[in-house]
Amino acid sequence: MGAVDEVVFLLEEAFSGEGIRETNEAQSFLTNLRSVDTSFWRALPAGGQRTIESITLHVGGAKVMYDDYAFGAGTLQWTDITVRPWPRGFAPMDEAIAWLKTVHGALLDHVRDLDDAALSEPRKANWGAERPTRWLLSMLMQHDTYHAGEVNHVRSLLDRDDFWRWG
């Protein structure tokens, strides 16, 4: 297995890895999103500003932006409908998740087209700087995992079960 295959595996794990089935522990974005009741999709926890809907749209939009700048024309803006297909409060949960899977798949297609040496090549980031390809992809992995935790926390606050089960 080459380096690109490893990167694809890690991107997939951060996005949709199942984690530990026996204890229902998962750190991936999509797996945490699947645990969300539809009544929580647009709900705000006390004192919160981010809904699970808005987090999901942000994660998908970041994938579109990184993909466009690293592998495409590098012209999209955060306000473009391709990046943000619904305004806040109007994204149907099932459609937003389907869109998220689609944009993740498009990114993976570009990564799979790379050879191992290309992981060291500089590519443009969506803020204009150039970074090694592997660095940009690492940011996307971390981004998925970070926001998976955020989804889990918002869901647990809304469900009133925000406590540690093991320690």
Segments predicted by a language model, with ranges:
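Short, contiguous alpha-helical
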Residues: 1-33, 38-84, 124-167
